[in-house]
Amino acid sequence: MKALIILGLVLLSVTVQGKIFERCELARTLKKLGLDGYKGVSLANWVCLAKWESGYNTEATNYNPGDESTDYGIFQINSRYWCNNGKTPGAVDACHISCSALLQNNIADAVACAKRVVSDPQGVRAWVAWRNHCQNKDVSQYVKGCGV
């Protein structure tokens, strides 16, 4: 009986945890969802961005105490401008989406919102991690061997 309880707790923790993509799995998924070359941003740059923003984790969150906003999901999309978490003062919600939708294992909503973000004048430069880790770097390693 004790073993069943422990097994149940282990399984529960696994089901609650977000999906952490493998690099090539993410590259293939992003390509299928139309991000390769979207607004001039290569697939390798998107994978690099996701690596440094979230470690490929769909359930990643990061609270920003300065403006009381939170970054959500695989692309760390911010609640101040892009999604609605019902808590961020003065939020814009430009993607017209609940922030919790950005934490799903199915990343279609996160990709749709990322397309909205990159369509703004700042483009992919909106992501600090991209500027710090991907901009002006050889990012080909992020899709190497993925067959994409």
From Swiss-Prot:
Highest taxon of source: Eukaryota
Reactions accelerated catalytically: Hydrolysis of (1->4)-beta-linkages between N-acetylmuramic acid and N-acetyl-D-glucosamine residues in a peptidoglycan and between N-acetyl-D-glucosamine residues in chitodextrins
GO molecular function: lysozyme activity
Class of the enzyme per the UniProt entry, highest EC level: hydrolase
Residue span, C-type lysozyme domain: 19-148
Annotated GO CC locations: extracellular region
Keyword Chloroplast carried by entry: no
Xref: SMART domains: LYZ1 (SM00263)
Signal peptide: 1-18
SUPFAM superfamilies: Lysozyme-like (SSF53955)
Active site, UniProt feature: E53, D71
Subunit structure: Monomer.
Sequence similarity: Belongs to the glycosyl hydrolase 22 family.
Name of the protein: Lysozyme C
Organism: Pygathrix nemaeus
